Amino acid sequence: MRAVVQRVIRGEVSVDGEVISSIGKGFVVLVGISVDDNENDVMYMADKIVNLRVFEDEEGKMNLSLLDIGGEVLLVSQFTLLGDVRKGRRPNFMMAQKPEEALKYFNLLVNEIEKRGVSVKTGKFQAMMKVLIENDGPVTILIDSKKIF
């Protein structure tokens, strides 16, 4: 499982010109689910997202998590994060999970983040979306449940 976590002032998702989800301060998380992901990857990712300390404390140090600031998550499924561009010029998406299975793990990730005390809004699975991301910093973190960046 791969995620791009962006610290935001606000974020929103629109489908067909209509805003379907929005958040204030927190994270917009673009998540790609791989063919070899399982529940352990979901638990790892949920824990990382909720406890990632990238919000400033009173001294200006990145020391606070979503839980500490009462932040929200806007979780958007993005299979293109699994695109392999090492060969050729067109991405190979063979590592992206099939939609039915990906949706199962996506929903589990939503539930696991919420269980840990953070409000989650989502995009629309398998839809063409417009994602508004008002970065704060910017602070962008890459997380992969199987690789170290």
Swiss-Prot record:
Gene Ontology CC, one term: cytoplasm
UniProt keyword list: Cytoplasm, Hydrolase, RNA-binding, tRNA-binding
InterPro entries reported for this sequence: Daa-tRNA_deacyls_DTD (IPR003732), DTD-like_sf (IPR023509)
Positions of short motif Gly-cisPro motif, important for rejection of L-amino acids: 137-138
Keyword Cytoplasm: yes
Record GO biological process: D-amino acid catabolic process
Catalytic activity, reaction form: glycyl-tRNA(Ala) + H2O = tRNA(Ala) + glycine + H(+); a D-aminoacyl-tRNA + H2O = a tRNA + a D-alpha-amino acid + H(+)
CDD domains membership: Dtyr_deacylase
Transmembrane segments: none
EC number: 3.1.1.96
Main localization of the protein described in the UniProt heading: cytoplasm
GO molecular function: D-tyrosyl-tRNA(Tyr) deacylase activity; Gly-tRNA(Ala) deacylase activity; Ser(Gly)-tRNA(Ala) hydrolase activity; tRNA binding
Function: An aminoacyl-tRNA editing enzyme that deacylates mischarged D-aminoacyl-tRNAs. Also deacylates mischarged glycyl-tRNA(Ala), protecting cells against glycine mischarging by AlaRS. Acts via tRNA-based rather than protein-based catalysis; rejects L-amino acids rather than detecting D-amino acids in the active site. By recycling D-aminoacyl-tRNA to D-amino acids and free tRNA molecules, this enzyme counteracts the toxicity associated with the formation of D-aminoacyl-tRNA entities in vivo and helps enforce protein L-homochirality.
Domain-related comment: A Gly-cisPro motif from one monomer fits into the active site of the other monomer to allow specific chiral rejection of L-amino acids.
Protein family (similarity comment): Belongs to the DTD family.
HAMAP family recorded: Deacylase_Dtd (MF_00518)
Protein name: D-aminoacyl-tRNA deacylase
